[in-house]
């Protein structure tokens, strides 16, 4: 238990940030799943629209240090590879 006012405030701030970060991480995972579902259903338009949203959100997450920038780049690259592999053959 914190005894100092600034420590109490730090605890409140940490709870708020933790909630926001977990919500954003969950959103990242959900978006990735939606893209994979669109790929599985062979829907290129939906997959590309979702991919654009996903890359934008990854960039924002990297910018705010939710994930590392190289992690974001790797996720974008791997998802783009999957999209190209499925829809280039079609």
UniProtKB/Swiss-Prot annotation:
Gene Ontology, cellular component aspect: cytosol; small ribosomal subunit
Family: Belongs to the bacterial ribosomal protein bS20 family.
General function of this protein: Binds directly to 16S ribosomal RNA.
PANTHER family per UniProt: 30S RIBOSOMAL PROTEIN S20 (PTHR33398), SMALL RIBOSOMAL SUBUNIT PROTEIN BS20C (PTHR33398:SF1)
Keyword set includes Ribosomal protein: yes
Cross-referenced NCBIfam families: S20
Feature: compositional bias, Basic and acidic residues: 1-11
Gene Ontology biological process: translation
GO molecular-function term, one example from the UniProt record: structural constituent of ribosome
Renumbered residue ranges of the record's region Disordered: 1-29
Iron-sulfur recorded as keyword: no
Organism: Leptospira borgpetersenii serovar Hardjo-bovis (strain JB197)
InterPro entries: Ribosomal_bS20 (IPR002583), Ribosomal_bS20_sf (IPR036510)
Highest taxon of the lineage: Bacteria
Keywords: Ribonucleoprotein, Ribosomal protein, RNA-binding, rRNA-binding
Gene giving rise to this polypeptide: rpsT
Name of the protein described by the UniProt record: Small ribosomal subunit protein bS20
């Amino acid at each position: 238990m914190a005894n100092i006012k600034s420590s109490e405030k730090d605890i409140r701030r940490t709870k708020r940030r933790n909630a926001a970060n977990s919500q954003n991480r969950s959103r990242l995972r959900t978006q990735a799943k939606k893209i994979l579902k669109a790929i599985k259903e062979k829907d290129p338009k939906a997959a590309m629209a979702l991919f654009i949203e996903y890359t934008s959100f990854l960039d924002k997450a990297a910018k705010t240090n939710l994930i590392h920038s190289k992690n974001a780049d790797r996720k974008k690259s791997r998802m783009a590879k999957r999209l190209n592999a499925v829809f280039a053959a079609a």
